[in-house]
C-alpha cells in the first residue's frame, strides 16, 4: 500500500469539529502518491470544459457570418470541426473519468486499509464500548461514501466550474452590461448553498449513524439466529429492525427533500436575472450596441448556465455526504492506538510469574457510562498477590464475576493494572514490547474464535511458519485428527465462519491444538474443556497434562474436577483472594473451596 500521511494530532472530538475544508485537505493528502493520475484527471476535465465553451463561442460567428452567407468557409469546415471536436471531447472525458476513478479507488483502498489496521491496533477498552456493527459500517459504507461522493463531486465541481468560468468570460467579452446583471445573483446563490451545505452535513452524519445501527442490528440478529428461533423472537427482531430501517429511510428522505428544494430555488433566482436581461434589451441604446448574434449568444450562455448551476447544487449534497463520511473515518483514526511503551525485548521467558498487590478497576478503561462513573465503583481486582515458579500450574476458582478472567486479561495487557505490578522473570510486564509479551502466552478461552479458513490454517494461526508435520502432531494431541480424517479434504477442509461446520467440542479441540502448536512458556486455559463430551475431555485432559509440563499454566475453572492436580489454587470472591493452597489443604480448611467442592459433588 502506498505510504499514507501521518495522522493529524487531533482528538476524535477535534476531528468531528474540523471544517469541511480541513477534512477535504486531509483527504487530498492521501492522494499525494497518485498525483500524476490526479493531474491527468484535471487536464481531462479542463479539456472537456474547454471544448464545450469553444463550441458555444462559435454561436455568434454562426449567426452573424455563417448563416448570413458572409463567410462560406465557416460552414464548409463546420462538419469536420464538429467530428474532431467531439472526438477530442470524448478522449478528455475518458481521461478525466478513468484517472479520477483510479486515484479515488486507490485513495479509498489506502484509507480503508489504514482504518482497518488502526481499529485492530486500538485498545480492548475501545472495542468494549464500540459496537462491531458501527465499525464494520465505517470500513464498508463510510469509505464507499467517500469514493462515490467525493470522486463524483470533484469531477462535477472542476468540470462545471471551468465551464461556468468560460461562459462568464464569453458573456463579459460580448457584453459586460448584460453579464453584470447575471452576476448580481451570485451572492444570493452563495448564501443558499451555504445554508443547504450545513443541512446536508447534518443529515449525512445522521444517515451514517443510521447505517451503523442497521449493520449492528443485522449482525447481532444473524449471529444469534439460533437463539432468536429457539425463543420465538422473530417478530420482535422484525419490529426492531423495521424501526431502525424506518429511521434510516427518514434520514435519507430528509436529504432528498433538501436536495430537491435547493435546485429549483436556485434556478428560479437565476430566471429572474434572465428575465431582467430580456427587459434590458428593450432599451434602444443597448439594443443598438449589440448584434443579433451577440444577443442570441448572451441569452444562450445564460440559459446554459442553469444546467451547471443545477449540477453543482446537486453535487453539493453528495460532496457533503463524502465529507461527513470523512469526518466519521477521521474520528476513528484520531483515536489513540493501544499504548506500547515497553522497550525491552523478550525472546522466551523462563516461566516465573508474580502478581504484587494488583488492583484493577474498569472505571479506568473509559468503558463505563456516566452514571457508573458517578458511583463509587468497587475494584474488579483487589490486592491480588501470588507467585508462580516455572512449570507450576495455578487454578483460579470462584463464582462468576469474581475476577478470574480479568486477571488473565491483565497478563496479556488487554488492560493495565490500576495499582501494583505484574512480573515475568522479575520484570514488570509493562516494560516489555507488547508483541514480545503476548507471544509468551497461548490462550484458550471459553469463547472459541475460529476463522473462515481451513482446519490446518486455524491450527497454525499463532505459528504460520509451522510445518505440516507440526500441525498434524498438534492435531493428534488435541484429538482433532479423530474427526478431520473423516472429512473429504482432511485438515484442508474449510470450516466456515467461526467454525460453523464443526460441533462445539470440535471447535474447542481446534483451539487447543492451536495452543499446543505455539509451544509458549505460559498457558492460559479459560474453561478450555467446558464444551467437550466426557470421552473427548478425558483425551484432552491427557493432552493438556503433557502440554503443561515445564510450562507455567493459569487455569480458570468452574468445574473443580479439572484442577485437582494444580500446584496452587486461588479462590476468589468479588475480586479478592479469600483462600489459596492446593486441593487437599483447601479441602482440609473447610472454607470457601470446600463449600464450592461440596456443591459440585453432592
Curated annotation (Swiss-Prot):
<dbReference type="GO" id="GO:0005886">
    <property type="term" value="C:plasma membrane"/>
</dbReference>
<dbReference type="InterPro" id="IPR003593">
    <property type="entry name" value="AAA+_ATPase"/>
</dbReference>
<feature type="domain" description="ABC transmembrane type-1">
    <location>
        <begin position="39"/>
        <end position="321"/>
    </location>
</feature>
<feature type="domain" description="ABC transporter">
    <location>
        <begin position="362"/>
        <end position="599"/>
    </location>
</feature>
<keyword id="KW-0813">Transport</keyword>
<dbReference type="InterPro" id="IPR039421">
    <property type="entry name" value="Type_1_exporter"/>
</dbReference>
<dbReference type="GO" id="GO:0034040">
    <property type="term" value="F:ATPase-coupled lipid transmembrane transporter activity"/>
</dbReference>
<feature type="transmembrane region" description="Helical">
    <location>
        <begin position="154"/>
        <end position="174"/>
    </location>
</feature>
<keyword id="KW-0445">Lipid transport</keyword>
<keyword id="KW-0067">ATP-binding</keyword>
<keyword id="KW-0812">Transmembrane</keyword>
<dbReference type="InterPro" id="IPR003439">
    <property type="entry name" value="ABC_transporter-like_ATP-bd"/>
</dbReference>
<dbReference type="Pfam" id="PF00664">
    <property type="entry name" value="ABC_membrane"/>
</dbReference>
<dbReference type="Pfam" id="PF00005">
    <property type="entry name" value="ABC_tran"/>
</dbReference>
<keyword id="KW-1133">Transmembrane helix</keyword>
<dbReference type="InterPro" id="IPR027417">
    <property type="entry name" value="P-loop_NTPase"/>
</dbReference>
<comment type="similarity">
    <text>Belongs to the ABC transporter superfamily. Lipid exporter (TC 3.A.1.106) family.</text>
</comment>
<feature type="binding site">
    <location>
        <begin position="398"/>
        <end position="405"/>
    </location>
    <ligand>
        <name>ATP</name>
    </ligand>
</feature>
<keyword id="KW-1278">Translocase</keyword>
<keyword id="KW-0472">Membrane</keyword>
<dbReference type="GO" id="GO:0005524">
    <property type="term" value="F:ATP binding"/>
</dbReference>
<keyword id="KW-0997">Cell inner membrane</keyword>
<feature type="transmembrane region" description="Helical">
    <location>
        <begin position="36"/>
        <end position="56"/>
    </location>
</feature>
<feature type="transmembrane region" description="Helical">
    <location>
        <begin position="80"/>
        <end position="100"/>
    </location>
</feature>
<feature type="transmembrane region" description="Helical">
    <location>
        <begin position="176"/>
        <end position="196"/>
    </location>
</feature>
<keyword id="KW-1003">Cell membrane</keyword>
<keyword id="KW-0547">Nucleotide-binding</keyword>
<dbReference type="InterPro" id="IPR011917">
    <property type="entry name" value="ABC_transpr_lipidA"/>
</dbReference>
<dbReference type="GO" id="GO:0016887">
    <property type="term" value="F:ATP hydrolysis activity"/>
</dbReference>
<dbReference type="InterPro" id="IPR011527">
    <property type="entry name" value="ABC1_TM_dom"/>
</dbReference>
<dbReference type="GO" id="GO:0015421">
    <property type="term" value="F:ABC-type oligopeptide transporter activity"/>
</dbReference>
<comment type="subunit">
    <text>Homodimer.</text>
</comment>
<feature type="transmembrane region" description="Helical">
    <location>
        <begin position="261"/>
        <end position="281"/>
    </location>
</feature>
<protein>
    <recommendedName>
        <fullName>ATP-dependent lipid A-core flippase 1</fullName>
        <ecNumber>7.5.2.6</ecNumber>
    </recommendedName>
</protein>
<dbReference type="InterPro" id="IPR017871">
    <property type="entry name" value="ABC_transporter-like_CS"/>
</dbReference>
<comment type="function">
    <text>Involved in lipopolysaccharide (LPS) biosynthesis. Translocates lipid A-core from the inner to the outer leaflet of the inner membrane. Transmembrane domains (TMD) form a pore in the inner membrane and the ATP-binding domain (NBD) is responsible for energy generation.</text>
</comment>
<dbReference type="InterPro" id="IPR036640">
    <property type="entry name" value="ABC1_TM_sf"/>
</dbReference>
